[in-house]
Amino acid sequence: MAKPEPDVVIPEGDSSKGAKLFKSKCAQCHTINKGGSVKQGPNLYGFYGRKSGASDYAYSDANKNSGIVWSDKHLFVYLVNPKQYIPGTKMVFAGLKKEQDRADLIAYLKEASSK
């Protein structure tokens, strides 16, 4: 069963700022290019609209069973504190507290994961 989307309002994001955030906060563990390698975390290419835990990566049961279909709203809340949003996730990232940083990163992820 799909997890309902959170009821949040997301500011407009800037993908160029999001690219910088991805490089500094995410690229140590993730790639986002088509055919990119799996690092400590999964390649994020094409993850928008996909069920959490659905790609070629050894996801935790928590991710596989979360019922999340990745969208802007799910990401916006998830990125505040991944371990709180999906208890039991392998994601070790502490999160992004600033709304604008999350909006910028989401704009970049959405753009880069579909190129």
From Swiss-Prot:
Q: Which UniProt keywords apply?
A: Electron transport, Heme, Iron, Metal-binding, Mitochondrion, Respiratory chain, Transport
Gene3D superfamilies hit by this protein: Cytochrome c-like domain
Q: Name one GO molecular function term.
A: heme binding
| Record carries keyword Kinase | no
PROSITE patterns, sorted: CYTC
| Any one Gene Ontology cellular component term annotated for this protein | mitochondrial intermembrane space
Q: Where does heme c bind?
A: 26, 29-30, 91
Instruction: Name the InterPro entries on file.
Output: Cyt_c-like_dom, Cyt_c-like_dom_sf, Cyt_c_1A/1B
Q: What is its main location?
A: mitochondrion
Q: Please state where this protein is localized.
A: Mitochondrion intermembrane space
- Matching Pfam families: Cytochrom_C
The keyword Mitochondrion belongs to this UniProt entry's keyword annotation: yes
Posttranslational modification, per the record?
Binds 1 heme c group covalently per subunit.
In which domain of life is the source organism classified? Eukaryota
Question: What job does the chain carry out?
Answer: Electron carrier protein. The oxidized form of the cytochrome c heme group can accept an electron from the heme group of the cytochrome c1 subunit of cytochrome reductase. Cytochrome c then transfers this electron to the cytochrome oxidase complex, the final protein carrier in the mitochondrial electron-transport chain.
Query: What family name appears in the similarity comment?
Result: Belongs to the cytochrome c family.
Which protein are we looking at?
Cytochrome c
Organism source for this protein? Theileria parva (East coast fever infection agent)
> What taxonomic lineage is listed for the species of origin?
Eukaryota, Sar, Alveolata, Apicomplexa, Aconoidasida
